[in-house]
Amino acid sequence: RSNVLTSQWLNSAVTYAYYPGSTFKIITASSALEEKLVSTSSSFYCPGYRQVRDWKINCWKRGGHGSETLVDAIKNSCNPAFMEIGAKLGISTFYKYFRAFGLNEKTGVDLPGEVSGSFWDVNKMSEVDLAVASFGQNFEITPLQLITAVSAVANGGSLVTPHLVERVVDSDGKVILDNTQESHVAMKDMTA
């Protein structure tokens, strides 16, 4: 009962991490576009699965999507296309962008109880791990981490630290707290 009472006061946007699933595909696509490994017209073929080592990893559409461009793969939420994109990125580049989008650490939001997600040790990550990570499985991030990362695409490539309050000023006009916009570049504006 105590855990139930305590959990009702936790902010699930920052205290619980989860598999982002297909919502993560925008990060995989943006990373590959930034590296010029794909373009919006790159072509993919989805037979309904992709074989990675000894694993047959299915698409949500068992019969497959057939031939598709990157734009189609995003619209179709095609797992095999994103596994191929992840393979093109490779483990170290995939991880580089995982970090660039701030997904390996807390966002820095001014809320109590924020946790960071969990990701593989890059030195222990396998091809299968990369394949499923490319479409948002087998690692965890918080909802706020995801929103912050995806917002970088909308912000012209700039990853902005989220804040609830911009500034606090006392009755004399003295600034007590100033959350100036902190950001770093996750990708080029042209890619975003």
Model-derived segments and their meaning:
Residues 1-22, 27-192:
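Beta-lactam-recognizing serine transpeptidase/beta-lactamase-like catalytic domain environment
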